[in-house]
Regions:
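A compositional/biophysical signature of low hydrophobicity enriched in polar/charged and small residues
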Residues: 1-87
Length: 87
């Protein structure tokens, strides 16, 4: 049986000041999130997610991430092809 392909995406998250630790922890518990890291620059957190398809990805972003108190906005960059490094 063929393996079902997932969609991957990086989500850049802008948050309210002083909320980095709390929001990063909350995002890290969301279904499909593989990594969530505080970063410097225009956005405050970078997230990598895998989802079943674009509809599932959109649902997670809209209902699970954007609804977290302190999340101001998100920007999603869908991965063109998931390439594994063997780790």
């Amino acid at each position: 049986m063929a393996e079902k392909r997932k969609i991957g995406a990086y989500i850049l998250v802008k948050i309210a000041p002083g909320k980095s630790r709390v929001i990063t922890d909350q995002i890290g518990k969301v279904e499909g999130i593989k990594t969530a890291h505080p970063v410097t620059g225009m956005f405050d957190i970078i997230v990598f997610i895998e989802a079943a398809d674009i509809n599932h990805l959109t649902d997670i972003v809209r209902t699970k991430i954007q609804t977290i108190e302190g999340v101001l906005r998100t920007h999603t960059a869908i991965v063109g092809e998931l390439v594994t490094t063997g780790d």
